[in-house]
């Protein structure tokens, strides 16, 4: 079937989004054109501005349209002395939603992966080391993903922290709230048993 070249181009562009295949892209394109052209225009404008104006924070490397993001420039966050190391800006958003953390962040934009040729400098660990040396950091919280690469990255950073006399801690991994033990994989259950804590009254 021959379709409009612009329509084909729109569908191909939508496929760059994660989880969007040919059918989903087609449905999105037709929905925007048939029912919500004003929404499509708003999307186009927001996307154009975001792509041209959003860069990386000079301190933590998260996404921001300023030189330094709002979290890093917050005096109360600076006084906290904690830095939470995460793999992506999306992780910051997830942690902020808990309301349980009041320090600053450092975004790796990935993890160590020697097989893929990704070393310490490729994920900004040289910049993190500069911060450990120059700033009054009391604790680095390692919130990398619980994967083989994430664990290796956390261990590498923990060793780096030790060189500068900075405490390093790892976020806990274990059984999810509301989960059933029989459905939990062995590795997660092992982490849960190893990280158990005493109940006091």
Swiss-Prot record:
InterPro entries: DNA_Rcmb_RecR, Rcmb_RecR, Rcmb_RecR_Znf, TOPRIM_dom, TOPRIM_RecR. Gene3D superfamilies: 3.40.1360.10, 6.10.250.240, RecR Domain 1 (1.10.8.420). Keywords: DNA damage, DNA recombination, DNA repair, Metal-binding, Zinc, Zinc-finger. GO terms for biological process: DNA recombination; DNA repair. A zinc finger (C4-type) spans 57-72. The keyword Zinc-finger applies. Residues 81-176 form the Toprim domain. It comes from the Bacteria. GO terms for molecular function: DNA binding; zinc ion binding. PROSITE patterns: RECR, TOPRIM. It holds the Pfam family RecR_C. May play a role in DNA repair. It seems to be involved in an RecBC-independent recombinational process of DNA repair. It may act with RecF and RecO. Belongs to the RecR family. NCBIfam families: recR. This is Recombination protein RecR. The gene is recR.
């Amino acid at each position: 079937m021959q379709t409009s070249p612009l329509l084909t181009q729109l569908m191909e562009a939508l496929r760059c989004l994660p989880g969007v295949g040919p059918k989903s892209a087609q449905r999105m394109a037709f929905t925007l054109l048939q029912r919500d052209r004003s929404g499509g225009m708003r999307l186009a404008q927001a996307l154009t501005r975001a792509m041209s104006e959003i860069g990386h924070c000079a301190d933590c490397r998260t996404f921001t349209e300023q030189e330094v993001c709002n979290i890093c420039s917050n005096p109360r966050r600076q006084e906290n002395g904690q830095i939470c190391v995460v793999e992506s800006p999306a992780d910051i958003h997830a942690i902020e939603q808990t309301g349980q953390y009041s320090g600053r962040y450092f975004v790796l934009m990935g993890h160590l992966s020697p097989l893929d040729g990704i070393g310490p400098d490729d994920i900004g660990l040289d910049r993190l080391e500069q911060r450990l040396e120059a700033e009054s950091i009391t604790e680095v919280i390692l919130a990398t993903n619980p994967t083989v690469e994430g664990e290796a990255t956390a261990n590498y950073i923990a060793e780096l922290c030790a060189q500068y006399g900075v405490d390093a801690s790892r976020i806990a991994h274990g059984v999810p709230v509301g989960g059933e033990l029989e459905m939990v994989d062995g590795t997660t259950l092992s982490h849960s048993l190893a990280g158990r804590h005493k109940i006091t009254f």
